[in-house]
Amino acid sequence: MDQGRQVFSVDLLERYATKNRGMITCMAAGNDVIVLGTSKGWIIRYDFGVGSSNDIDLAVGRTGEQSIHKVFVDPGGSHCIATVTGVGGAETFYTHAKWLKPRVLSRLKGLLVNAVAWNRQQITEVSTKEIILGTQDGQLFEMAVDEKDKREKYIKFLFELEELPEAFKALQMETANISSGMRYYVMAVTPTRLYSFTGIGTLESVFASYKERAVHFMELPGEIPNSELHFFIKQRRAVHFAWLSGTGIYHGGLNFGAQHSYPNGDENFVENKALLDYSKLSDGTEAVKPGSMALSEYHFLLLIGNKVKVVNRISEQIIEELQFDITSDSVSRGIIGLCSDASANVFYAYDQNSIFQVSVIDEGRDMWKVYLDLKVYAAALANCRDPLQRDQVYLVQAESAFTDKEYLRAASFYAKINYVISFEEVTLKFISINEPEALRTFLLHKLDNLSKDDKCQITMISTWATELYLDKINRLLLEDDTAIENRDSEYHSVIQEFRAFMSDCKDELDEATTVKILESYGRVEELVYFANLKEQYEIVVLHYIQQGEAKKALEVLQKSSVSVELQYQFAPELIMLDAYETVESWMANKNLNPRRLITAMMRYSSGPHAKNETHEVIKYLEFCVHRLHNEDPGIHSLLLSLYAKQEDDGALLRFLQCKFGKGRENGPEFFYDPKYALRLCLKERRTRACVHIYSMMSMHEEAVALALQIDPELAMAEADKVEDDEDLRKKLWLMVAKHVVKQEKGAKRENIRKAIAFLKETDGLLKIEDILPFFPDFALIDDFKEAICSSLEDYNKQIEQLKEEMNDATRGADNIRNDISALTQRYAVIDRDEECGVCKRKILMMSGDFRMAQGYSSAGPLAPFYVFPCGHSFHAQCLITHVTSCAHEEQAEHILDLQKQLTLLGSETRRDINGNRSDEPITSTTTADKLRSELDDAIASECPFCGELMINEITLPFIKPEDSQYSTSWDLRSETNLANQRTISLPV
């Protein structure tokens, strides 16, 4: 214990605390509230939280001397119970912090209450909830009081000591909510015994159960009249207890979750029990029993004489002695007792007049040393405040284990030390005694305890540990063959441990250094394992290829973290090692670019293959072309070349006939170079394939010529493919015909019959005269008689058909001429009251009433007009005006220009009529007719109301841009303008 700093200190709180109301007989505290009981029957309440005090006379109305026997205050400082003794017997009172007058608990009259157990978990400011009272007669009662009630709610008898009737001196209670209800834990002490009660339900049912079962108690020899029981409360829960007994201080931990069953069927919640004998406090002299006791987290405060001895609960050593400033009039009795305030974590001592406060200052600061001296290392570590303290605990543990030759255990403790011993000292310790196992253990544990910021140290230690692992593996391999089974087991165990270490430290180990170390020890498998961890897959794959394990290499390459470049890099080796597995791997990976595998595929294809062996490259290329729809010309060309080298040309022809680009707009139908394909097929003598390629390239003459070398039927099919060029098609069929005629070796008449039959296959494209030149000059014409007659008959039919067509054409021309003549005589009948569609005036009006259209001559006295088949009629001038206003600008100008020219020609004619001769009157009239015809076409080709002109007007706006000023004039005026107008009120 640090002697330089006091853990407990004493201060005088109140010198004359009783205010001349007698002498202090008892005291209780809770939540910065102190309640004193005096020898004259007064209770004095000090509330240090608000700085107030008040006193209440409990002896009012009682005769004789009255003294306060005991006072009890709840942990919240609101509720107080006091027992008064005097001539008239004992009486118990209840008072609340807000009250000025006490309330008599009449049902307890005559009972001397020595102890009260508060329900700390349930109590509130306005209600005590259930509490337990212990009496001088050895009885227990349950009671509850509410601040608003005029009397206690109830008082129930719970229990009575029958075997050994003694007074109950102290009580404590704890509760816990569990699934089956409320569990109660009660401890009670008498001068010789400590009783414990527990059960589920209500207090009444719990104590009633002890009629059927034995009460659990602890009895110690000796007797003490002032027996006390204290709980230490931490976070509103009791964690340990202490009983001031006749023999010593019986104490232990409290575990209210424990379910320790005893033979008597009871359950105990006390653990780690111990007894502090009073003889340990006497320094060899006669043991003195304390007059009072208080309990802190780690210490007992024992009142012995006028001193308070502070005893460490763990070490059972006195650490301090507290002195009090006692007045001369208090010497007769000295310090009377101690009490504690669990809520405020302070203690109080009192004599007849004064109150002293005992404060605690960081009482747990040296507890780590106490536990360390007792070798309770876990508790010592739990109480350490800084890394240096923890290091000292670890050092003691390490040195102890090292002394006991438990080197592995010592290594684990040394690894946790950061300050009190250096890394070098520890390693030298293990090296000096030749303990590589312990050294490796130390290094591994040190790695676990280093922070991530110590990168250099972590790398160094990891590398050293790697060498130690490899050294251990080599030593196991070099051991004698004795106990081979055990050696192999240990060897495999170390290998697994080493691999786990590399996996954990892969980011800390320097890659280059570790690889060199593994190579130097010849640990190829571990090197591959480490390379895998570091994602150096090139090393891993190369190792598997060297071992001939293509499948394992492919499994590595298939990992998502492996770069696809390695697939291309090792493709040539892998396909030669295991073509099937390699191709299956390629087909499973959709991200590969087949073009970059061409080198590997060509290497495989260049080698010999069995006749019935599946060509793996062809399989992969077919997968690319048909399943992946690959369009790379290189892939298509390679597949084409492999097909061309096969004995059966069926696959080649099927490939050539496939249109892989069909359906794509503006795209090719195939993706290989047809010229390359042609050269390849010519080289490999794949004639049918060459014919197809020639045809595909529109080289039909070459295709037919080549086809004739192997199969005339194929040549005919090729010739028949040409459909859009009749001359070329005929030329191709002539080539076939010539070949057929020249190649026939039978009798002459038979050859002629076959040639005639061939003509029928051409569907009339070739005539007998087309193939006659192919026959020899000495061929008899009789052999062609039938064919020639048939041909002449066909010509005769064609001539007759042409004559009929000429007659039909003549009749058609006559009909057209008649229709034209009839058009000049066509007329229309109009009503006398018919109106012009534009001006709405009558159509049949005198020319004097209407200005004659320029360029038109009047039809007698009537103005010129137009009548359309639909029934609409228009004056000529109205129609011109309407059409020019609706037509586009260019057409309107053309119409006006024609009208102007007609006007000029009309004026010249009128001058001639007036006496001026015209040299070319006929020419002018002809010109006027042409202009008038053009004008008619421009304005009267269709009705302006029923034709396209009216349809186009749908898209025009109602208000034209030039009429915008009229549009704005129709807008409503603004409110401002309306406000300026004068209004006239109209009578209603």
Curated annotation (Swiss-Prot):
Effect of deleting the gene: Embryonic lethality. Heterozygous mutants produce some yellowish seeds with developmentally retarded or abnormally shaped embryos. Conditional dexamethasone (DEX)-inducible mutants exhibit abnormal root morphology.
Localization of this protein: Endosome membrane; Vacuole membrane; Cytoplasm
Gene Ontology molecular function: zinc ion binding
Residue ranges the record marks as coiled coil: 785-819
Family matches, as Pfam families: Pep3_Vps18
Domain of life: Eukaryota
CHCR repeats: 589-749
Keywords of this entry: Coiled coil, Cytoplasm, Endosome, Membrane, Metal-binding, Protein transport, Transport, Vacuole, Zinc, Zinc-finger
InterPro entries linked to this entry: Clathrin_H-chain/VPS_repeat, Pep3_Vps18, Znf_RING
Signal peptide stretch: none
Zinc finger extent (RING-type): 836-886
Principal place of residence: membrane
Keyword presence, Ribosomal protein: no
Bilayer topology annotation: Peripheral membrane protein
GO process terms (BP): intracellular protein transport; root morphogenesis; vesicle-mediated transport
GO cellular component assignments: CORVET complex; cytoplasm; endosome membrane; extracellular region; HOPS complex; plant-type vacuole membrane
Record family assignment: Belongs to the VPS18 family.
SUBUNIT field: Core component of at least two putative endosomal tethering complexes, the homotypic fusion and vacuole protein sorting (HOPS) complex and the class C core vacuole/endosome tethering (CORVET) complex. Their common core is composed of the class C Vps proteins VPS11, VCL1, VPS18 and VPS33, which in HOPS further associates with VPS39 and VPS41 and in CORVET with VPS3.
Function: Essential protein required during embryogenesis. Believed to act as a core component of the putative HOPS endosomal tethering complex and of the class C core vacuole/endosome tethering (CORVET) complex. CORVET is required for vacuolar transport of SYP22. HOPS is required for the central vacuole formation. Involved in root development. Plays a role in vesicle-mediated protein trafficking to lysosomal compartments including the endocytic membrane transport pathways.
UniProt name for this protein: Vacuolar sorting protein 18
Lineage: Eukaryota, Viridiplantae, Streptophyta, Embryophyta, Tracheophyta
Gene name in the database record: VPS18
